[in-house]
Design a protein with these regions (language model features):
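Active-site scaffold segments
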Residues: 165, 190-193, 210
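Conserved acetyl-CoA-binding loop-helix of GNAT-fold acetyltransferases
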Residues: 184-196
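Terminal substrate-recognition subdomain of acyl/acetyltransferases
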Residues: 1-104, 205-252
Length: 252
C-alpha cells in the first residue's frame, strides 16, 4: 500500500463528474473519475494512481470513466525494451543539437508566449488556444508531485518546453509544446525519444504517455513507440502489431 506521510491510499475519495463533451471523439459525451483531496496525492500515491490509469491536469487527478465508451487506453513504453524506428532515428539525429536544461516548474513569459503560439497553430478552436495566463499556470505549473520543466534551446532560442512528472517506476509525460512555425521540424517525436532516454539514465522502467485513442488523430501516434503497453481491463499488456500507427507520411 502506498503511503504519503503515513496517509493510506484508501484515504482518498473518488467521484464521477457530470457528462461533458468529449475533447477527442466528436458527438460523444465523456465522464471522468476524480481522486480527491489533492493535498493527499503526493508522488508515492500518484505513482500508484498512474499505474491504474490516472493522469493529472494541474492538481486535478482523473481518469476517463465514460458510460458507454472505453476508447481511452492508458499507454506506457518500457524504456529498456524500446527500439526506435528508422523514422524516429532520423528525428533524433535531426534535433540532436538541441540543448536541454532541467528546471523546477517556473512561470516564464517566454514559455507562455510559445505556448500560445503552439496552441493557436496546432489546436485552433480546441479551447486551449484561448488560455489566459492563469489557465496556463493552473494547467502546467500547479503540481502536488515531483515535477520538472525541461527547456530545449537551439543556439539560445527556445524551441520546446516539456513538463514531466517523476514517478516511482518511471516518468509521466504531462505536456509538451514547441515552436510551430518550423514545418520540417519533428520536435514532438524527438521529445518522446528524449524522455525515454532520460528514463533509462534514471534507471526507471516506463514512460507514461497518457491515453491512446484509436480513432483520434491527435492521440493515435502514441502506438508508434514500440513496444507499447496498454492498460486494458485493468491489466497492462503489450499492444500488438495491429495497433501500430503510421504518421501522415506513412512512417512508423
Amino acid at each position: 500500500m502506498s503511503l504519503l506521510n503515513d496517509i493510506p491510499l484508501t484515504a482518498l475519495h473518488f467521484y464521477l463528474t457530470a457528462p461533458y463533451a468529449c475533447s477527442y471523439l466528436p458527438d460523444l459525451q465523456a465522464r471522468s473519475q476524480v481522486a480527491t483531496p489533492a493535498v493527499l496525492i503526493g508522488t508515492p500515491v500518484y505513482s500508484e494512481l498512474v499505474q491504474h490509469g490516472f493522469r493529472r491536469s494541474g492538481a486535478y487527478t482523473y481518469r476517463p470513466h465514460c458510460d458507454d465508451c472505453r476508447a481511452c487506453v492508458p499507454l506506457r513504453v518500457p524504456a529498456e525494451q524500446f527500439t526506435a524506428s528508422r523514422s524516429q532515428r532520423r528525428a533524433w539525429a535531426q534535433h540532436a543539437h538541441l540543448q536541454a536544461s532541467l528546471h523546477p516548474l517556473l512561470d516564464s513569459a517566454e514559455h507562455y508566449e510559445l505556448y500560445q503560439r503552439y496552441q493557436r497553430a496546432r489546436h485552433p478552436n480546441g479551447g486551449m488556444d484561448n488560455d489566459d495566463c492563469e489557465s496556463y499556470q493552473n494547467f502546467l505549473l500547479q503540481s502536488q508531485v515531483d515535477s520538472l520543466l525541461v527547456e530545449f534551446r537551439e543556439q539560445g532560442v527556445l524551441r520546446m518546453v516539456s513538463v514531466i512528472d517523476l514517478l516511482s517506476d518511471g516518468l509521466s509525460s504531462v505536456y509538451t509544446f514547441y515552436e510551430p512555425d518550423l514545418p520540417r521540424a519533428r520536435f514532438g517525436v524527438y521529445n518522446v525519444l528524449w524522455q525515454i532516454e532520460l528514463c533509462r539514465k534514471l534507471d526507471l522502467d516506463f514512460v507514461y504517455l497518457g491515453y491512446w485513442i484509436k480513432h483520434s488523430r491527435k492521440m493515435a501516434y502514441k502506438t508508434g513507440y514500440r513496444p507499447a503497453q496498454g492498460l486494458i481491463d485493468g491489466i497492462w499488456q503489450p499492444l500488438g502489431k495491429e495497433f501500430i500507427t503510421k504518421d501522415a507520411h506513412g512512417n512508423l
